[in-house]
């Protein structure tokens, strides 16, 4: 993982601890929703939460937009994005502050997982 996305010494944890936290989150989501979510389902859930308009039917394009909102929200936790405005329909728009560093697929997945753990810990504790 890139240095500017590492959580810092106060958050150092073993890979096993990280995986345990991740699996605990998935288990909690499975308990709440009756199905174990994948990364895309969690991104969609976060996007719906950030939109704040409750459960609704969304088009395929809206679902992609919700996942983009989620990604921006997650990476705002590490200073890469900030909420710029909410449009007249209530959809949030984020401004890129600094690029998210290049990462291969496995690193990207780990970055998303780490940010999701932070999101659910910060926003739901």
Please place each PLM-identified region on the residue numbering:
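Helix-rich interaction surfaces within compact, conserved domain-sized segments
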Residues: 98-125
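Amphipathic alpha-helical interaction segments
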Residues: 36, 50-53, 73-86, 119, ...
């Amino acid at each position: 993982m890139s240095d500017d996305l590492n959580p810092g010494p106060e958050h150092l944890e073993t890979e096993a601890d990280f995986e345990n936290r991740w699996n605990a989150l998935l288990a909690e989501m499975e308990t709440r929703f009756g199905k174990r979510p994948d990364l895309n389902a969690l991104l969609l859930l976060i996007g719906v939460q950030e939109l704040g308009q409750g459960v609704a039917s969304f088009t395929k394009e809206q679902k992609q937009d919700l996942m983009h909102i989620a990604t921006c929200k997650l990476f705002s936790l590490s200073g890469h994005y900030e909420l710029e405005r909410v449009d007249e329909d209530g959809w949030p728009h984020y401004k890129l502050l600094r690029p998210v560093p290049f990462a291969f697929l496995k690193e990207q997945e780990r970055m998303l997982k780490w940010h999701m753990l932070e999101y659910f810990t910060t926003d739901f504790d």
